[in-house]
Amino acid sequence: NKYRRKGQWLYRKETVTYNTIEDLVSAYAGYIKGVVLYDERVPSTSNVASAVAGAEDLLPIRYDLDSESLYSRLVLGGPRLKVKRRLINEDGSVMFTGSGVIPGTNRNSTGSIKNDPYIWYIENYMKTGKCNTEYAAYYLDQYWKQNPGATVRNHHTLSNHDFFISKRAFFFDLSPWGDEPATDEPIQKVGTDLATLKEMLLLAYQQNKGEKYCYIGGFPSWAFKYTKHAGGIHDDVPTEWEFLRLISAYNAFKDADAIAIGALANASFWQHFPLEERYSQPWVTHEELKQRGLLTEDGKVDVKGRNFLIFYVGDYDASSWVSQFTSLTWDDPNRGKVPMMWAISPVLQERVPHVLHNFRKTATKNDYFVASDNGAGYLSPGMLQEPRPISGLPSGLQSWAEHCKPCYEKWGLSITGFIVDGYAPGLNWEGMECYRSFSPNGIVPQKLSSWSMLFGNMPVLRADYDINDVEPKDAAVAIVNRIREREGLPFHWFRNIIKSPTWYVEVVEELKKIDDSICLLDAPSFFELLRIYLKETAPFAGGTGSREDPFLISTPQQFDHIREYRSQCFRLINDLDFSDYVREDGQSWWPLGEWGSGDNAMERFRGFFDGGGYSIRNLSVERKAHDLSIFGVTEGAEIINLKVENCSIIGEGRLGVLTGATFSTKIEQVDILDSQCENRLSDHGSNAGGLTGPLYRSVIKNCSVKGGNVYAKDCAGGISSSMNEDSEIIDCYSVSYTHLRAHETDSYLV
């Protein structure tokens, strides 16, 4: 009743009580154009019915001849609503049989009784523009009735439908996995659910013109479907991340009504709550930091042996979670006693604007708000970067920035408290530029090649551990142990899920008992100090690592430090001579990028490097290893305007003078002079290229290789050792000796 109080939105508003469903429907008869009937024997028709209801102002009702059913009370009796759409035959028999031609379409059956109703909807509503593809709903169909006790009773999430019906959204309950049949229909062909979902997402992308993002409410209902709980082969979080990876590829995000806490009621009403134009938050000044003993008089971070701590107060990336936990967390009487960085998605303003408004109006000076994962909606931003796996669509970064900016401006946000990368690539330099445009005071991604970096003026800190111990003392011990493991950087981030202010107060008290050098900060102080600290310690000749202000490289030592900042932007400002260079570990050269854990590994070089027309000279390496080269393994990188002279690369396989294995990389105006790349240390066949190792989805343009040697036992090339069909070599030439040891004497001038 908060909003019924004097001065509040619902003060003195009239309330009408209806005693029966018949009375309620009769009262709103002017808004209801009829009924769409669904068939519980084909559970997916229940979701299709909700989608049709929104598109045509109908009520979705289950066909049921029982005298107390809604069908009997509202169609056969009471207001006698007209049946306008049927997902069941008039005689009550099943319409969708999983064979022949799908009724009402020209398409053959998918072979899946579950999927055919969705194809019917695609043909009759999505392709005809009758639905609003800016909204979608991922909620359980009637299959939940087979095991209603799998989790809390209200996780049927029927109460969540009203908002999405009001938005004319499309509905679905489909598996994101392409390596097993959907667990709710094990006889279907593998990948059928996934194919239908991709078709829906692509249509949404096309109708939204790639400019608007699709807002999906819901979450994989892993207690019921698509995981090991339901007889599948995948665990819970992997299923969450695979769905996330999939929708992100098509410019969609989710408002994550996750399992057990996923129910939400009356959002169609609360969406009309009047928000203020702006909810501002102040940023800390350097003078304030000096007064608090955090900065010295000359503006440097005054560490004094301290470790600075921030808690990610989550997970508030779902309207249902924010709504259900307000009374347990926000209304805790101990809120305000310690600094708390509340991570709440601004896109929740769509369904629970009244809750977000209440937070801002009742916040204390110790309550500060940042965006939760991963901005204005939960998606994998690495899937917005080109090339985009799954969809092959153009970059979605610009449209993501345009989606997030107004949300951040409205709510006074400048920090993205956590970026869940999941199964997606980490942010490359273009992804970093995207976030810098709307989250200038900080981001915390899972995947980062170093613990921290400064991108432009944006501090970037790698996410660390989740700390969710029930007992505050146990949590404090875990925090202290982790901080002591991580020597060096005195800034520490920990994620907590649905913890009360009382828990935080008690954790801080326990920390003081164990180690009083640990200092919990408010979010502005933490990220501003981190920014200053990173400026003080950056090992380059200048710059901040962004495209317009790249890190400046003037010595071999600075060039070697690129490996700690692999996602950023660099420019060479003079020639580099590696004749006498020895790395800090006393070893010979090692490539800047490494293979790492495989696809999308953060150990790969994914930055932007502008050689400025200068040269790298006399770099040499001879090791029994793969991907030996200057830059090593690259992915999503760009290297331009560089000369390489008199360099020697001798190793095992995937060798190149400039790069080893080269993924989704652009190389332009790079000249290799009098250098050698030789595969002489391998015990089996391998490859080498005068410029790069094998190319995958990459482009080389206006490059040359002159003089020198290329030698390999398997594949050898004057430019690259090999390339897949998605790569291009444009306006390049090589004049070098290329030796392919089919026979010891074979050699070719290429």
Name the predicted role of every residue range.
Residues 266-360:
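Active-site beta->alpha N-cap acidic-glycine motif
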